[in-house]
Amino acid sequence: MKLKRYFIVWIGVSLMLLTVLLTLFTTMADDGMVWDYQFLFEQVVKHFVTMIFPMCITLISGYMISREYTDDTLKNIETLPISFRKLLAGKLIVSAILSLFLGIVCFVFTVIANFIMGYDGFALIPALTGLVQMALLGFFLYLTMLPIIVLTSRYKGSFLVGVIVAFVYGFIGMFANGTLQSIYPVSAALGLINYRAGAEGVMWNKGLCFISILIMCAIAVSYTHLRAHETAAN
């Protein structure tokens, strides 16, 4: 399978490790905060959403899609019983699976870090909940990045622009609060996994969160159809 040759997937795994290491680095601050498993998990999620994962999944997805242009294999599609639209959809589905996988990888690194640091509070039920939350969070964040991925992977090397845009897009989510946090797609992904629900200042409107991400999906699907028509015309 071609995916096995994509070193960039291993870069994704490395970035998940970086997410946890970056979180552990913040423990060096002498702010009097007592760390336990739950607090570590919440901090990892924060860095996962606002700094690492948006650019990570955009990099991986954009690279896989753009290979058809950089390897000059797109012209060979005409000789195969498969349309460009189906090929693109297949790669987007693979990216969706990878988003779930990377979320799980990040969670595993988080648990390992928790045991290495010797934090209290680890229990089976919260851990299983965290596993599901992190996997779904990766998937929902992928959906929010779909328009960027599809739009910027059209030309050779242009997906790197998408990586930069995705990083800024994710970082801005750090500042969303109030009603805006349920509207802004990146932070809306947190609402769908019920992140810190009930904590001070954290109130989610699940309906708005769902609509926000659904709109991003609709934009991506529309542009995917447009790209397919352009490719067929050429």
Question: Which residue stretches match the model-derived regions?
Answer:
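Conserved small/polar residues in nucleotide/adenosyl-binding loops
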Residues: 224-231
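Short, membrane-exposed interhelical loops at transmembrane-helix boundaries
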Residues: 185-203
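Long, hydrophobic alpha-helical segments
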Residues: 45-67
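Hydrophobic core of alpha-helical transmembrane segments in multi-pass integral membrane proteins
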Residues: 15-24, 107, 210-223
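Aromatic- and glycine-rich beta-strand/loop motifs that create alpha-glucan
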Residues: 1-13, 154-157
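Secretory targeting signals
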Residues: 20-53, 89-154
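Transmembrane helix segments
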Residues: 22-25, 151, 155-191
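Helix-loop-helix units of permease transmembrane domains in multi-pass membrane transporters
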Residues: 64-96
